Curated annotation (Swiss-Prot):
An essential GTPase which binds GTP, GDP and possibly (p)ppGpp with moderate affinity, with high nucleotide exchange rates and a fairly low GTP hydrolysis rate. Plays a role in control of the cell cycle, stress response, ribosome biogenesis and in those bacteria that undergo differentiation, in morphogenesis control. The gene is obg. InterPro entries: G_OBG, GTP-bd, GTP-bd_Obg/CgtA, GTP1_OBG_dom, GTP1_OBG_dom_sf, OBG_GTPase, P-loop_NTPase. This is GTPase Obg. Mg(2+) binds at S172, T192. Gene3D superfamilies: GTP1/OBG domain, P-loop containing nucleotide triphosphate hydrolases. Residues 1-158 form the Obg domain. Its EC number is 3.6.5.-.
Length: 335
């Protein structure tokens, strides 16, 4: 199962203790204090990276701790600092404090770093407490504890293109054609049960970077009310630059293809109104099941009902119309 939400208790390292020690040399029988300070505890750092796509590496982990600082030593030597613990997460990760529900950080770029829990300071050795009036202090202090936080990690995928549609609309087949990969497909609903990422080569030679495309699991009516895990799926649409609605042009027993599009638009607007402003293309899929005249009739029907939308006739199975779709991607995204 695609892992897009986890909760982990994070503990920074404790500072090392300061020590009481005395200078002992042959010709200094009354040597002074010589105890060093403790090392600083390791911090916990969160870093975002484009090569990480989920929280899979943290599956079943409930607790993580950075290294403690070491105690001070004689000869005024400080203890070694604890090593920082760096957790690498995907772009699009949102951090939330479980206790306060405060949003701690939103990672939207590659290489962003956040110190989420700071290590404790090291304790002071007795040398630190030497004064003109107290030349032989016997005091040393313990290290401070590191910060502790219960943190929820939530992933909202960042992709250039998000495929949105009802189960069995042919999204996965189209995804395979666009990304030149082989996602499992089948003639039954909910073949895709978790978001899948792929790369679509850009046709614009001056723009070498491929588009990142996300196949979002099938949306059903009532998704904004969390029917069919709808909220878990809809959240991944928020971070995409372009939405590709995939509609089975032949429709289904339940409703007409025009009604399917209306429901999809309504579901997105009920979830987040600002999704109405996101750039989108409507792919009328499975045209290989229709005769040329029937295709044109269906297209004209959609254009009458949704005059402001951009439609593309295509077949994810045969690849017909996919080149035109790629050109539209370039026009919308290569800016």
């Amino acid at each position: 199962m695609f892992l897009d939400r986890i909760t982990i208790e994070l503990r920074a390292g404790k500072g090392g203790n300061g020590v009481v020690a005395w200078r002992k040399e042959k010709y200094l029988p009354k040597g002074g204090p010589y105890g060093g300070n403790g090392g600083v505890g390791g911090s916990i750092i969160i870093e975002s990276a484009t090569h990480v796509y989920s929280f899979e590496s943290y599956r079943n982990i409930r607790f993580l701790k950075a290294e403690d600082g070491q105690a001070g030593a004689t000869n005024n030597r400080s203890g070694r600092n604890g090593k920082d613990l760096v957790l690498v997460v995907p772009e699009g990760t949102l951090l939330r404090d479980v206790e306060t529900q405060e949003i701690l950080y939103d990672f939207t770029k590659d290489g962003e770093r956040l110190v989420i829990c700071r290590g404790g300071k090291g304790g002071k050795g007795n040398t630190f407490f030497k004064t003109s009036t107290n030349r032989a202090p016997t005091k040393a202090t313990p290290g401070k504890p590191g910060e502790v936080r219960q943190v929820e990690f939530e992933l909202k995928l960042i992709a250039d293109i998000g495929l949105v549609g009802f189960p069995n609309a042919g999204k996965s087949t189209l995804f395979n054609t666009l990304a030149r990969t082989e996602v499992r497909v089948g003639a039954y609903p909910f073949t895709t049960l978790q978001p899948v990422l792929g790369l679509v080569p850009c046709q614009e030679k001056l723009y070498q970077k491929p588009w990142i495309i996300a196949d979002i699991p099938g949306i059903i009516e009532g998704a904004h009310q969390n029917r069919g895990l709808g909220l878990d799926f809809l959240k991944h649409i928020e971070r995409t630059r372009l939405l590709l609605f995939v509609i089975d042009i032949c429709g289904c027993e339940r409703s007409s293809p025009e009604e399917d599009l209306r429901i999809l638009i309504d579901e997105l607007l009920h979830y987040k109104e600002n999704l109405a402003d996101k750039s989108r293309i409507i792919a009328l899929n499975k045209i290989d099941d229709l005769l040329p005249d029937e295709r044109q009739e269906r297209l004209e029907s959609f254009q009458r009902l949704f005059p402001s939308e951009k439609f593309v006739l295509l077949s994810g199975l045969t690849g017909e119309g996919v080149d035109l779709l790629n050109s539209l991607f370039t026009n919308r995204l290569a800016i």
